[in-house]
Amino acid sequence: MAISSNLLLCLSLFIFIITKSALAQKCSNYKFSTNRLFESCNDLPVLDSFLHYTYDSSSGNLQIAYRHTKLTPGKWVAWAVNPTSTGMVGAQAIVAYPQSDGTVRAYTSPISSYQTSLLEAELSFNVSQLSATYQNNEMVIYAILNLPLANGGIINTVWQDGSLSGNNPLPHPTSGNNVRSVSTLNLVSGASGSTSTGAGGASKLRKRNIHGILNGVSWGIMMPIGAIIARYLKVSKSADPAWFYLHVFCQSSAYIIGVAGWATGLKLGNESAGIQFTFHRAVGIALFCLATIQVFAMFLRPKPEHKYRVYWNIYHHTVGYSVIILAVVNVFKGLDILSPEKQWRNAYTAIIVVLGIVAVVLEGFTWYVVIKRGKAEASAKTSQRVGNDGRSLYV
């Protein structure tokens, strides 16, 4: 009986492993309605896309079927090989979209700039047997590309989707998964991987993440904390002057880290010609300028008893709070552009909410202390005045 139970358990585990493995290989289980067969397939990492292909090294022919699933109406799709680079410019694309009359149009379009309109033209290599089907929200592009084996059999690939205006493709989104849809494909081994650029093989996505983390931590978290320190710790006489040095340290550190993040953003902008995030960029420049003015204005800070100190305080508080508001807005704008997993936005939102609650509680406590201290000082002054007059309060 025990042997039978163990055998059943082993059989169940075996079936589970086989089933899990089969489910994990999404593209290998797909059956084309045209009964076409391909030797290899890759589950592309973004945009719900899959590439099925067969490569004949003797003829240099690459037979492909590019599938784009979960496609909403009014969308175009494209798959491309870039023989000269790793991005969009220089890509030799195959485009397809459903037309208003119900037919599907498939054609070739070389990409020469980021302002492309996806106009039809011949590619730098021969393409034959080009066709496409669209049903059940899935577009499939079929083609044979003549690609003589080069660079060890590794090719750079790009795939995209975007909206249509009538029968005209509109520019695709320039954030989220639409800027991650690049990969390399080894036609010999079948291996695929992310495309790397820049020194040390750091990808643009990694640089975007570094840019986001540096700016989120500095402008978006440390700056508000520094303001909270200055606003609420100085109410305690025992914290003077420690609160000031802590405030300066926090804000200075935030500024230094923020400048590093800002410089990373400038570098990303230079490496991504044609991709513009105008609002995000403008707010970032405004942040840098205001924060820099704030730093250098510290050298012009009048002494507490100086007659112009009140005006300096008004300026300092106005610029400081403006920086914090712009920083939080721009961090959320950056999250919209980067489109990370939802947990990152939730985490930053939670941090801002907690800081907001802390500020509200401390604001109430500060006013309580200030009012109580004011009453005590007023009472002390009254007692002193009465004492000086030689009269009792009880007379």
Curated annotation (Swiss-Prot):
Named cofactor requirement(s): heme b
Broad class of the protein's primary localization: membrane
Q: GO cellular component terms? A: membrane
Q: What does this protein do?
A: May act as a catecholamine-responsive trans-membrane electron transporter.
The organism that produces this protein has a lineage beginning with: Eukaryota, Viridiplantae, Streptophyta, Embryophyta, Tracheophyta
Q: What is the top-level taxon of the source organism?
A: Eukaryota
One molecular function GO term is: metal ion binding
Q: PANTHER family per the record? A: CYTOCHROME B561 AND DOMON DOMAIN-CONTAINING PROTEIN (PTHR23130:SF167)
Q: Which organism is it from?
A: Arabidopsis thaliana (Mouse-ear cress)
A UniProt-annotated Pfam family: Cytochrom_B561
What span is annotated as the signal peptide, if there is one?
A: 1-24
Protein name per Swiss-Prot or TrEMBL? Cytochrome b561 and DOMON domain-containing protein At5g47530
